[in-house]
Amino acid sequence: MNMYHDADRALLDPMETASVDALRQHQLERLRWSLKHAYDNVPLYRQRFAECGAHPDDLTCLEDLAKFPFTGKNDLRDNYPYGMFAVPQEEVVRLHASSGTTGKPTVVGYTQNDINTWANVVARSIRAAGGRKGDKVHVSYGYGLFTGGLGAHYGAERLGCTVIPMSGGQTEKQVQLIRDFQPDIIMVTPSYMLNLADEIERQGIDPHDLKLRLGIFGAEPWTDELRRSIEQRLGINALDIYGLSEIMGPGVAMECIETKDGPTIWEDHFYPEIIDPVTGEVLPDGQLGELVFTSLSKEALPMVRYRTRDLTRLLPGTARPMRRIGKITGRSDDMLIIRGVNVFPTQIEEQVLKIKQLSEMYEIHLYRNGNLDSVEVHVELRAECQHLDEGQRKLVIGELSKQIKTYIGISTQVHLQACGTLKRSEGKACHVYDKRLAS
């Protein structure tokens, strides 16, 4: 059911108000174009399609996409840097790349049309979150090869907002500018927003004296408990933006302010599937699995059935006719196997945030003790709970240990530390320190 206000209807793109049938017809036409574009211009796709016995002309309905092969991050690395580009080099106006923590980075390219599409979907995302022309947007995503900063920047400008291009880091200065410039919206990772919230409190600033009303958070998974914590501490609406560089960057999906029930996928540009991460079988909507995207409008770097490794489910549309992404429970490649139990860091986070005496900061340390895994969870007391005596602290430790055992099924050693002890992030947070191989 569409829940936008009639007064805002004129602001929406036509596909945001289209019928589901019209959307599916648009997707079919764009899929045919995208598959042919990839097949005609990228040798890897031509080879893979042939190996599967598939040809772009075989796509007669959306379900036929399952006949085509998957693409993964390793394909981009194996064809580094430009082997998967589908246009001549002179048509590529922008290059971005992943951080490349292991091996070669993944390189993504954009034509001018791609840049325009990207700006449009991010502008649509900010508007869906409640942003409007004339709002001031404080961008704390990193600028540079990372797509977050520039993606947010050009989308905000396309919407007609005033952009404050702060980038990451310099936390004290960030807060100074938030106080002085009075932005309406902040775009940042949720973990760094916690860092900024701590600094706002440290400087004695009342959040009600700030003009911030919206936080658009992405680039890492976060829980509903963390959302509530941020909203309560800062008095803002916290919304989830989803994206990945290989598909476009931020702006692939965006939570809508009307419903705040998970990011709406901009399905006129990105076609989603959910698959079994082991077998590759396409799963029905509503079932948990790995999210896969096929680009529908990208020129420089078309992506066919790209495996994101994000574990989620597809849900019916609410604020828009497009489907939504359920809360991402983790990644198929960051799942921890601890004494035979599959564990995702976000599951630990959920339990930490249920305990009112604890801050949002946590670390998971994994060791090998003989033939067994040993798990330590390091957490912090909130600043206002520093006065707790030893007995009270033991109760907090016991409560967290019990909850993790009950809800996740593993035994842990909980280490309770003073407020401000754990490392703060200026970008994507690192919560897991796996030292089992070194043990």
Curated annotation (Swiss-Prot):
UniProt temperature dependence: Optimum temperature is 30 degrees Celsius. The enzyme is heat stable.
EC number: 6.2.1.30
Broad enzyme group: ligase
Parts forming coiled coils: none
pH-linked activity: Optimum pH is 8.2.
Activity regulation information from UniProt: Inhibited by divalent cations (zinc, copper, mercury) and by the sulfhydryl reagents 5,5-dithiobis(2-nitrobenzoic acid), N-ethylmaleimide and p-chloromercuribenzoate.
GO annotation (BP), single: phenylacetate catabolic process
Molecular-function GO term, any one: phenylacetate-CoA ligase activity
Entries under CDD domains matching the protein: PaaK
Key words, A-Z: Ligase, Nucleotide-binding
Quaternary structure (record): Monomer.
UniProt family annotation: Belongs to the phenylacetyl-CoA ligase family.
Function: Catalyzes the activation of phenylacetic acid (PA) to phenylacetyl-CoA (PA-CoA). Involved in the phenylalanine metabolism. Can also use CTP and UTP as substrate.
NCBIfam families: PA_CoA_ligase
UniProt protein name: Phenylacetate-coenzyme A ligase
Organism whose genome encodes this protein: Pseudomonas putida (Arthrobacter siderocapsulatus)
Lineage: Bacteria, Pseudomonadati, Pseudomonadota, Gammaproteobacteria, Pseudomonadales
